[in-house]
């Protein structure tokens, strides 16, 4: 004869089954919540990456305040790299911190890209204090200028804070020749752009400034200003 299960035993069995079922339900809910959180995190991360400024927007050449040194930025394998165009062209891989801020992977050097009023990236701030200007030329390559482009630079220049000091600029086959009138020393320069020149070893920069279609002044190095006299 089949024995009937006593009520107390039946109640305990139901209680155990209920607890087991509850545990399974809780586990399933936690698992689903984990998947949902992971999906949201992945979706948010993907959305953030899609909204980030493309690395190619930062590529180019940037000139340090001393006018002699340059840094280039280029994209490679979905990473941004910075290369010093001096000191044996040391190269740094950069790690993105947010949309426009990066750090060198091994050294932790900070780099922030800044926009101008037109919304274009025009500067790079190195180490939080050194502002480098983006330039539209490759400082390693000699530019080809016409005779008329070189001729507009020719003339006599007076030092801004001492008119007794004079230099002359004359066109040459390779670029221009600067002559110091106080000692007759001459230095040859080749163009990197229409208005930027370097001497043979790249340690002496000349930057010409134009206003109203005419060359009005020349800056040697960072702040050595000369005014065109003719």
Task: Show which residues each predicted segment covers.
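Peripheral terminal and inter-domain segments
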Residues: 40-230
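Sec-dependent signal peptide recognition
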Residues: 19-25
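Secreted/luminal cysteine- and crosslink-motif detector
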Residues: 30-31, 133
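Cleavable N-terminal signal peptides
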Residues: 26-27, 37
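N-terminal secretory signal peptides that target proteins for export/translocation
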Residues: 1-18
């Amino acid at each position: 004869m089949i024995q009937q299960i006593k009520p107390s035993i039946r109640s305990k069995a139901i209680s155990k089954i209920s607890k087991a079922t509850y545990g399974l339900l809780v586990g399933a809910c936690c698992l689903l919540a984990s998947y949902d959180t992971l999906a949201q995190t992945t979706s948010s991360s993907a959305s953030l990456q899609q909204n980030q400024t493309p690395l190619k927007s930062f590529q180019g050449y940037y000139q340090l305040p001393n006018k002699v040194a340059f840094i280039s930025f280029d994209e490679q394998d979905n990473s941004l790299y910075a290369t010093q165009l001096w000191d044996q062209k040391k190269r740094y891989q950069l790690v993105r911190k947010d949309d426009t801020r990066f750090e060198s992977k091994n050294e932790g050097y900070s780099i922030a890209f800044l926009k101008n009023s037109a919304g274009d990236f025009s500067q790079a701030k190195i180490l939080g204090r050194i502002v480098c200007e983006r330039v539209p030329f490759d400082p390693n390559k000699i530019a080809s200028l016409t005779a008329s482009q070189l001729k507009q630079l020719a003339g006599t220049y007076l030092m801004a804070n001492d008119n007794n000091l004079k230099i002359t600029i004359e066109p040459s086959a390779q670029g221009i020749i600067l002559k110091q009138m106080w000692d007759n020393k001459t230095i040859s320069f080749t163009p990197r752009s229409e208005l930027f020149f370097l001497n043979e070893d790249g340690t002496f920069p000349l930057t010409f400034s134009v206003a109203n279609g005419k060359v009005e002044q020349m800056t040697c190095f960072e702040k050595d200003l000369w005014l065109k006299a003719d």
